[in-house]
Amino acid sequence: MDKTEKVEHPFTVFTLGRICYQKNPTLFNEIAEKLPEIRFVWIGDGEFREELKSKNIEITGWADRATAIRYAVNADVFLLPSRWEGLPISLLESMYMKKICVVSNVIGNRDVIKSRLNGFVCDTLEDYVQAIQCAKDNKVGNMAEKAYLNILEQFNTRVMSMEYQNIYENRQ
């Protein structure tokens, strides 16, 4: 299978990165427990691995980039319930792959995702569950396409370098 080839799969929610306090594996687990019919995948590993107890969670362990991309391509929703973020590259990459993105209401996430326009910004466990259920029930319209277009328009290297240039030129 080519690393970007989509294959038939059950509805899948994924995240990737170190399983640590910042990434909020406890909340990830609670969300999975509320949606037992949905497959959850955590691409990565870490010291908080034991927090992921729900039977519908698969932990891949550390994966090379090609394997991680294969998991991501064959998933439907990117879930990022972090306690804090900077500018999460995994979120930008997921938007580029046209995934429905469900994220916590923290700086970084909410700077990129405009709730119900190009993804979902969540405050409560119930918000996450409802957002994922909307995605599963295909009640998201062209949200993934809007996220993809946001990446092309706002987060490409040309636009970002122009923004940095403006910052430097306007410094007093």
Question: Which role fits each region the language model picked out?
Answer:
Residues 62, 70-75:
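Short alpha-helical donor nucleotide-sugar binding micro-motif in glycosyltransferases
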